[in-house]
Amino acid sequence: MTVVIGIDEAGYGPNLGPLVIGGSAWKLDDEPATAAERFASLTDQVTADWRAGNGPPWGDSKKVFSRTRTGSPLEPLERGVLTAVLARHAPLPTTGGDLLRLLGLSLPDDASHDCWHELSTMPLPQATVTATCQQQADTIHSRCQPRGIRLLSLACRWIFPAAFNASLDTGCNKSDILSQLSLGLAAELLQQQPATEAIIWCDRHGGRKRYAGVVSHCFAAARVEPISETATQSRYLIHARGPKAHASGQPTTSVSFSVGGESQLPVAVASMTAKYIRELAMGAFNRFWTDQQPGLMPTAGYPVDARRWWQETAARREQLGLADPDLWRRA
């Protein structure tokens, strides 16, 4: 048996809103060497089902979610994530709070709390149909089972501007924060499946090419062995601590950071989950601020439009007593 974990982020570039890390963990009834081939076969089938209208749109979240598409831009993203929830035999969440608990998230306990509060009470689904999600989850089961693949869990972690800025003040940079959150989530998912061969697939973190130090820190590893550090992929083997660290037959864990990592299905599902959570959060954020300042145009939080939004809300933010670091992520 092998555990395969996919990790990706949403919201790394914006100045407003949370940085969200998504993770998906899968069980493969075979050796690690077969994982890439098995998941490639599953990806081909899922893509064919999607194009035929019979399966979820599991893929790169940046392509699945498009504000220019006809109809609701949220629908395919939401359908993909809620189908994944059902595929792991979890009940479908009916509120944002249910979904946050399922993914291991809680709202920030800082001055910005009111901006995000609606997220816990909003009804789900927002844009898709429950029956469609169930039908597509059944399709996923029928595709995974003959390949010896099963979705074990979904999880997210997030960091809001106040905590992000506080981390910068300790000497971390933006890339450090992303890597520590991502690998911290991967380590948590791995701990749920102890004594098991494991593969962790991550999308590359910006232009960063060397990860041995942060991998060693997040996994408390005695030694991290670099296998490759190229322009397209960085790959490592984790050698565990403890008296059995060098014993033969001990489970191995490999970690890879790849350009275009979303092409691997576990990473794609993680990417979509992170993106869905961020979009729900920004929806709650924009509704809060529209109530505070009628006529204010919503924002996705990316730098150019975030500056427009920041200028237009300056007076109201001052009235509410919100300091700049509570809402504006510095990097």
Regions found by a protein language model. Give the residues of each.
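RNase H-like, Mg2+-dependent phosphodiesterase core
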Residues: M1-A331
